[in-house]
Each structure stands twice: as structure tokens, then as C-alpha cells.
């Protein structure tokens, strides 16, 4: 009986699509990919380069695009299963709640490296549970992360108002 139940559960789980419970929508990217980020201790060769433009689904399966609108962008690439990301999100949300987002800046969380077999799946529930108030985008096949040169989590990419890379950073940002 136990073996039969385990087989039935396994068949049910394996027949679910890999993206079950995730927002739906196509990810599109235009422009040249950034080089992979080498790390904080190396000069970032992407500084000053134009960032790739992209469109992807948000938590409601609405397509959101990164585009020139006069605002600088702080892109926060997150993995729902990453312990450092799980620490970063509430700290950043607390800063947003306490200090606010500066005028002329958008903070965009990009959920990537999504794995339904790991904790905090689906990522939109995790971000909702954390009270995330800013834009959420879902990089369903890690295409955006790859185009932005991701190599670790959390991964920040700061863009000026013309969507050129100012700086990239991995790891948690100090609260101060």
C-alpha cells in the first residue's frame, strides 16, 4: 500500500508541468548580453555598457518591460531557494517601508533559477509572504539572468536613467 501510494504520488508529481503555479508569459530580450560578472574585487567591465532590454511576466502573468522612462533601475535578481536572498528581501522591503524608494528610481525583483523542488516555491508566494511591494518579474528559463551576466545570488544590477550599467554586485547590500 505504501509503495503503491508513493508510485501514485510520483506519477502525479512527474506529470505536472515544470512551471505549474508560475506566472505565464514569454520572456523577450533585445540588445547585447553583458559579460559574466567577475566579482566585487575586479573592475566591472560592464560599467557604462547599455543593458539588454527585456519583457517578462509579473506575478499576475502581465507582461512588464524594462524601458527608458526617465528612471534609474535597481534590478535585484533572486532565487527563491537562496538563503542570502531570503535574508535580503525583508531587509530591502523594510528599507522601502521605512525610507521609501528615491524619486527617479525603480526597484525590480527578478525571480530566476526557479526550481519547484526547492523551498519557497512558487517564488511569487514567497515574495508576497515577505510583503514585497515593488515590481516582480519572472525569468522562467534564466534568460534574463544570463543576459545580465549573473553568477551568484542575490545579484544587483544598477542602471542609470539611460539604462546603462552603473555597477553590479553580488551578495547582500548593507542596510546602511
Each language-model region and where it sits:
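Structural microenvironment flanking redox-active thiols in thiol-disulfide oxidoreductases
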Residues: 86-130, 140-147
Amino acid at each position: 500500500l505504501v509503495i503503491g501510494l508513493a508510485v501514485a504520488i510520483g506519477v502525479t508529481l512527474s506529470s505536472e508541468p515544470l512551471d505549474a503555479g508560475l506566472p505565464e508569459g514569454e520572456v523577450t530580450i533585445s540588445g547585447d548580453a553583458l559579460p559574466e560578472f567577475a566579482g566585487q574585487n575586479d573592475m566591472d567591465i560592464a560599467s557604462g555598457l547599455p543593458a539588454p532590454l527585456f519583457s517578462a511576466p509579473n506575478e499576475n502573468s502581465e507582461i512588464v518591460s524594462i524601458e527608458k522612462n526617465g528612471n534609474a533601475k535597481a534590478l535585484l535578481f533572486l532565487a527563491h531557494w537562496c538563503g542570502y536572498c531570503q535574508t535580503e528581501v525583508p531587509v530591502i522591503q523594510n528599507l522601502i517601508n521605512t525610507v521609501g524608494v528615491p524619486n527617479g528610481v525603480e526597484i525590480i525583483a527578478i525571480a530566476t533559477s526557479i526550481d519547484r523542488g526547492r523551498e519557497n516555491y512558487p517564488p511569487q508566494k514567497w515574495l508576497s509572504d515577505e510583503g514585497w511591494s515593488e515590481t516582480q518579474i519572472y525569468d522562467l528559463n534564466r534568460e534574463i539572468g544570463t543576459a545580465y551576466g549573473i553568477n551568484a545570488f542575490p545579484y544587483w544590477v544598477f542602471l542609470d536613467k539611460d539604462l546603462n550599467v552603473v555597477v553590479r554586485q553580488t551578495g547582500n547590500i548593507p542596510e546602511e
